[in-house]
Amino acid sequence: MGHAMTAQHQSDTLLHRLNTLPPKRYGVFLLNDDYTTMEFVVEILTEIFMLGQEQAVAVMLSVHHEGKGLCGTYTRDIAQTKQQQVMQRAKAEGHPLQCIVEEI
């Protein structure tokens, strides 16, 4: 009986650990292209990602100079929603802006 209790305790401990792990985080990135205006990128960053003007400009410059810029990190569902919002807005306004989600 002692062995069964130990095995149950180990199982409960493992389950507790699994249930308390923080959710994976995902980065939402904008990718550079030759057509989307810098102003539109800043708009996206301030309106969808709620960045302040100064931070939005810094991310936009990363996109422009490094080819990719991190807009924020979120749980998977929120990251995918942000990505969809960016893609829908870009398409609606005629910009080829691309947005990707990567596990951090």
Swiss-Prot record:
Stored InterPro entries: ClpS, ClpS_core, Ribosomal_bL12_C/ClpS-like
Signal sequence segment: none
GO biological process assignments: protein catabolic process; proteolysis
Annotated family: Belongs to the ClpS family.
Role: Involved in the modulation of the specificity of the ClpAP-mediated ATP-dependent protein degradation.
Subunit text: Binds to the N-terminal domain of the chaperone ClpA.
Annotated NCBIfam families: PRK00033.1-5
Name of protein: ATP-dependent Clp protease adapter protein ClpS
UniProt organism field: Neisseria gonorrhoeae (strain ATCC 700825 / FA 1090)
